[in-house]
Swiss-Prot record:
GO MF terms, alphabetically ordered: 6,7-dimethyl-8-ribityllumazine synthase activity
Main enzyme class: transferase
Role according to the record: Catalyzes the formation of 6,7-dimethyl-8-ribityllumazine by condensation of 5-amino-6-(D-ribitylamino)uracil with 3,4-dihydroxy-2-butanone 4-phosphate. This is the penultimate step in the biosynthesis of riboflavin.
Gene name, Swiss-Prot/TrEMBL: ribH
Binding site for (2S)-2-hydroxy-3-oxobutyl phosphate: A84, T85, R126
UniProt EC number: 2.5.1.78
Protein's pathway: Cofactor biosynthesis; riboflavin biosynthesis; riboflavin from 2-hydroxy-3-oxobutyl phosphate and 5-amino-6-(D-ribitylamino)uracil: step 1/2
Protein's name according to its UniProt entry: 6,7-dimethyl-8-ribityllumazine synthase
UniProtKB keywords: Riboflavin biosynthesis, Transferase
Organism name: Bacillus cereus (strain AH187)
Entry GO terms, CC: cytosol; riboflavin synthase complex
GO BP field: riboflavin biosynthetic process
Length: 153
C-alpha cells in the first residue's frame, strides 16, 4: 500500500511562526507561505501567525502552537545569514535541532522553513526570486504532512 498526503488544505488549521530578525526576507517568506496555503484551500481564518524576535526564539512558540491542539501543522520561517563570528553556527544548529524535535514530541508536523545562508543574496534568492520561495514550499509541505500524518491518527 502507498500512503501519500494530498494537497487540498480545506478544513486544515495552520500555525506559522516567523522570526522578525531579517524581516526584509522573512516577510517575503511569510507572503509565500500564506499564498501557498490559500492557493491550496486553507481559509485565511484558519491561519494564525506569530512573530518572534528572531530565529532562536522560533522553537518555543512553535512547540506551544503544536501542543495547543488547535493546529494540524505548524510552519517555522526565519532567516539566519552568516556574519563574521561563530554566532551563525550556534543559532542555525539550535534552531534546526529545536524544530526537528518538535514533530516527534508533539505528533504534529512542524515544518522547517528557516533559511540558513552564507550571504544576503542567497537569502533573497530563496525568498521569491531565482530559487523560488521557501515559504511557499513550506506551506505545501505542511499541507501534505498534515494529511499524511492523519492517516495514522
Amino acid at each position: 500500500m502507498v500512503f501519500e498526503g494530498h494537497l487540498v488544505g480545506t478544513e486544515l488549521k495552520v500555525g506559522v511562526v516567523v522570526g522578525r530578525f531579517n524581516e526584509f526576507i522573512t516577510s517575503k517568506l511569510l507572503g509565500g507561505a500564506l499564498d501557498g496555503l490559500k492557493r491550496h484551500g486553507v481559509e485565511e481564518a484558519d491561519i494564525d501567525v506569530a512573530w518572534v524576535p528572531g530565529a532562536f526564539e522560533i522553537p518555543l512558540i512553535a512547540k506551544k502552537m503544536a501542543n495547543s491542539g488547535k493546529y494540524d501543522a505548524v510552519i517555522t520561517l526565519g532567516t539566519v545569514i552568516r556574519g563574521a563570528t561563530t554566532h551563525y553556527d550556534y543559532v542555525c544548529n539550535e534552531v534546526a535541532k529545536g524544530v526537528a524535535s518538535l514533530s516527534l514530541q508533539t505528533d504534529i508536523p512542524v515544518i522547517f522553513g528557516v533559511l540558513t545562508t552564507e550571504t544576503i543574496e542567497q537569502a533573497i534568492e530563496r525568498a521569491g526570486t531565482k530559487a523560488g520561495n521557501k515559504g511557499y514550499e513550506s506551506a505545501v509541505a505542511a499541507i501534505e504532512m498534515a494529511h499524511l500524518s492523519k492517516q495514522w491518527a
